[in-house]
Amino acid sequence: MLPGLRRLLQGPASACLLLTLLALPPVTPSCPMLCTCYSSPPTVSCQANNFSSVPLSLPPSTQRLFLQNNLIRSLRPGTFGPNLLTLWLFSNNLSTIYPGTFRHLQALEELDLGDNRHLRSLEPDTFQGLERLQSLHLYRCQLSSLPGNIFRGLVSLQYLYLQENSLLHLQDDLFADLANLSHLFLHGNRLRLLTEHVFRGLGSLDRLLLHGNRLQGVHRAAFHGLSRLTILYLFNNSLASLPGEALADLPALEFLRLNANPWACDCRARPLWAWFQRARVSSSDVTCATPPERQGRDLRTLRDTDFQACPPPTPTRPGSRARGNSSSNHLYGVAEAGAPPADPSTLYRDLPAEDSRGRQGGDAPTEDDYWGGYGGEDQRGEQTCPGAACQAPADSRGPVLSAGLRTPLLCLLLLAPHHL
């Protein structure tokens, strides 16, 4: 031992050193290599590091974990700690999520698995146990189907992003447990039909986006129970007709977009036309594609005399649902047998401002008002450092000495020159 150091450990200096050792904070898990960690709230940020797997030895106290823009291929049980509130894994190479991966993340509120182009299927129990999950992002993957109970038990879910997948069909009661869901994004898929009970259970739904699919038919009861829906997008599909009863089930509807569909303005259009005569909504144009003499006209501006040659409409009791011997064409409002199917249209992305017709009344909310808080997923997946995730939280501190360390270390600094 150096003579100077021996003198430092004797007398008053030894007491000072003891105070210093007692004031040292307990040892905590280190931050994973190439990651950045913050203490308040406990955050680990590891985005854009070309990781092929989730880093080992994540601090168990982590509440926010950002792993987006890496090369992670699979997720296994035991990888994540139970204190996680936010988990971002978008823009990776995920192809497999093993059963039980998220089972013990009972505090998790946001899970982003979007923009994983190799994620083609999910196990039925993938999200089991996530009872506090509020936001689930599965956009821009390659999902062609979803298990019937994939969302079972997600009773707190409010935002569900399923856009830009390859979904061909949605099972009845797929969303039955999502009583608190307010936003459902299904645009940019390959859906062809909306069945009778596909949206059953979504009593809190406010916004439903179905544009850019291949829809040819909507069951007359498909929207039954969506009493709070204010925004419905059905543009850029292959709809030639739409049952008026389907829209009559939407008493809170504010904004409706039906443009870029091959609308048939013959007798099949009368239920939809009749609904428009009663409804007060902000709507896009509904341009007629057939018959030739009405091509280019707006379905909403047709007159009662345009339907004089049509058979009288079948009366329907309020709240009744057609069943039994009714033809599926009538239930879905599609063309009768023998009519040529409409070609699926390409994804319609950017509507012109004049596409919406304003409601009556100067104080009515605009569509932009409703979308003010919506963060587009298209831009999010391209960010390498989204929002505050890449910055230290406002209340976090850098390498600043705690109050318990300042006095002992100051004592050592003052004594050291006299003993060395």
Curated annotation (Swiss-Prot):
It is found in: Cell membrane; Cell projection, Dendrite; Perikaryon; Cell projection, Axon. One of its GO terms (biological process) is corpus callosum development. Residues 1-30 form the signal peptide. Residues 261-312 form the LRRCT domain. Cell surface receptor that plays a functionally redundant role in the inhibition of neurite outgrowth mediated by MAG. Plays a functionally redundant role in postnatal brain development. Contributes to normal axon migration across the brain midline and normal formation of the corpus callosum. Does not seem to play a significant role in regulating axon regeneration in the adult central nervous system. Protects motoneurons against apoptosis; protection against apoptosis is probably mediated by MAG. Interaction with MAG is controversial, and may be indirect. Interacts with MAG. Does not interact with OMG and RTN4. This is Reticulon-4 receptor-like 2. It comes from Rattus norvegicus (Rat). The lineage of its organism: Eukaryota, Metazoa, Chordata, Craniata, Vertebrata.
